[in-house]
Every structure is written in structure tokens, then in C-alpha cells.
């Protein structure tokens, strides 16, 4: 470590004695950018990640709810949409009710996985999501499928999403969108043939309502 010299004067009855003592210098304080730094400079310096978000819903005007959710996601600090898949229609998963609409969005963000997930949950709540019982009909479901190459296994968040590979309504739009974003980071997906077979087995099919393509990012 760097050192500096400090002169210490010691008084004595006979004479003044000057003693030089070397003490370590404190290292300079280096502040790294934080995600909470929402200034243009702070956001530009923060590392960016591609987050993949699955959207689902079967209550109300689902396409309109999706559009609002995408706008809210894009409004998060240091976040913008990279692309959105077509809409897919799916039979309710392990439940009864109206057909689901599903899509997948790719998002570039500086937010860490946990912070990004909490933001998604807040958007769900603002747009009327309720959880009366498992697999209940819903206005909006936002699932974080992957966040860069992050891996997580906590009660709050598992990455990559542990059940995405089982769900045609996730895999079909995810594969479609990822083909348009070849440089984006994502986990390995099943083959096209395997996804098509899963779509047939689970009743997932393309079904974009009028106006959805106009709202596509």
C-alpha cells in the first residue's frame, strides 16, 4: 500500500525531537454504478441483460392488457423491448375457463433478476391479477423465463423457469421470437419438431386478434 510521511513533534524538557512516522494511506473510494442510479450516465454504464417474459391471460380484453403490460415493462428504468412474439391461443392449463392468449417478449434491461421479477409482479397487480386458487382464470400472468445466463434456485425465483420446457404455450412463441433475435442469450430450446408435437398435444395454436401486429415492438 502507498504510504505517506507524517512529522510528529515530541516535547521534552531538554529539546524538541522530531520523529517521522510512515502510515498507510487510505485507498481512494471507488463507487460503481448501481441500478438505483437512474441518471442517463448511471444507466448507460450498467451491464445489460436480455430477459425473456411470458405473457398469459384469459379474462377481459387480453390483447389490450398485454399492450399495457408491455408499455409498463418498457417504462422500467434502463429497460426497453427488443421484440414480441405473435399471440397464441391455448386451452386452459390444468384448469377450466376461457381460452388463454399467450405471447413471449424479449426485454433488454439493467435490472437484476430479483428486481425485474418484483417489477413484473407489481405490473400484474396493477392490471388486476388475482390469485384465488392455483391455475385460476386471470387478467394477466407475467413469468420470467430467463434473464441473461443467470441461474437461481430460491423460493422467490428459479432461473431458467423450471416448467417452461413442458409448456407449448411458452415454447412456441419463445422459439418464434428467438429466431428473430439470433444474438440474444437464452437457454437451449427443444427442436421445432418437438415443439410442434407439444403444441398438438396441448392445443396451442397461433391466434393473433386484430390490431396485435400493430402493437408489436
Sequence positions of predicted segments:
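Low-acidity, Ser/Thr- and Arg-rich intrinsically disordered low-complexity segments
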Residues: 1-5, 12-13
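Basic polycationic patches enriched in arginine
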Residues: 2-3, 26, 31-34
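Short alpha-helix boundary/capping segments
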Residues: 13-15, 136
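Nucleotide and nucleotide-moiety/phosphate-recognizing core
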Residues: 29, 38-139, 148-149
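Flexible, gly/pro- and Lys/Arg-enriched active-site loops
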Residues: 90-101, 111-117, 121-217
Amino acid at each position: 500500500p502507498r504510504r505517506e510521511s507524517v512529522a510528529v513533534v515530541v516535547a521534552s524538557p531538554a529539546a524538541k525531537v522530531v520523529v517521522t512516522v510512515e502510515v498507510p494511506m487510505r485507498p481512494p473510494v471507488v463507487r460503481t454504478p448501481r441500478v438505483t442510479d437512474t441518471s442517463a450516465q448511471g444507466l448507460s454504464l450498467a451491464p445489460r441483460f436480455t430477459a425473456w417474459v411470458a405473457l398469459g391471460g384469459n379474462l377481459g380484453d387480453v390483447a389490450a392488457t398485454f399492450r399495457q403490460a408491455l408499455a409498463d415493462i418498457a417504462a422500467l428504468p434502463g429497460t426497453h423491448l427488443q421484440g414480441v412474439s405473435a399471440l397464441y391461443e391455448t386451452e386452459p392449463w390444468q384448469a377450466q375457463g376461457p381460452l388463454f392468449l399467450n405471447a413471449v417478449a424479449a426485454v433488454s434491461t439493467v435490472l437484476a433478476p430479483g428486481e425485474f421479477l418484483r417489477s413484473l409482479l407489481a405490473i400484474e397487480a396493477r392490471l388486476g391479477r388475482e390469485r384465488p386458487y392455483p391455475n385460476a382464470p386471470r387478467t394477466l400472468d407475467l413469468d420470467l423465463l430467463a434473464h441473461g445466463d443467470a441461474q437461481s434456485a430460491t423460493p422467490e425465483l428459479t432461473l431458467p423457469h423450471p416448467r417452461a420446457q413442458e409448456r407449448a404455450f411458452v415454447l412456441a412463441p419463445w422459439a418464434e421470437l428467438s429466431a428473430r433475435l439470433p444474438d440474444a442469450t437464452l437457454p437451449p430450446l427443444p427442436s421445432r419438431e418437438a415443439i410442434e408435437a407439444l403444441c398438438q398435444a396441448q392445443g396451442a395454436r397461433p391466434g393473433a386478434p386484430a390490431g396485435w401486429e400493430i402493437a408489436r415492438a
